[in-house]
Amino acid sequence: MAEYYLISQLPSLDGLSENVPVPITEERFYDICSRILGKKAQDELSKLSLVPPRNYEPSGSAVLTSWNAGEKNLRLALGKVRAEKLNKQFDAENRTFTTDRMQAVRAAVEMDSPMEAEKVLNRYRMEYLEAIRPMDTFSEDFVFYYCLKLKLILRMRQFDAENGKAAYRNIYDSIMSGEELEVRQ
């Protein structure tokens, strides 16, 4: 029942165009959740990430388990295709990848612009997330789906051509000069 009250307070993330501001911040989302969700759901939410842990353990949530498996497979497919392009070996953990996943990965790897490649991958991620969207809008899984979608939208909005060029130039210059690169989180 708590999920009903939570979901009814959240603005829709469906159909947002790139020019429209995101109607809720991550902080506000977590604040609302902290007042309504139980401890177990809050613990799951606090661990939720777009990047699955290397050795993730399946959770009680079908959405989180599917997301983590799908993202891991996307990253393994990306590593495999990049390695093939460089004629290198890559351990893809004996996985087979879906045709749509491989099409997205190959399209991204062939892009000249890293930013455009990331857009292709993020579109694929959004399509995948929509494919695992829970049917029950007022469930705990829907809260996790909403959180993943919010994080993905916010991540996609952070891309900026000028900042990307500056970061690329910084990396390139550090390689050419042999200096250690400062990693920013």
Model region roles, listed by residue range:
Residues 1-185:
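Extended alpha-helical surfaces
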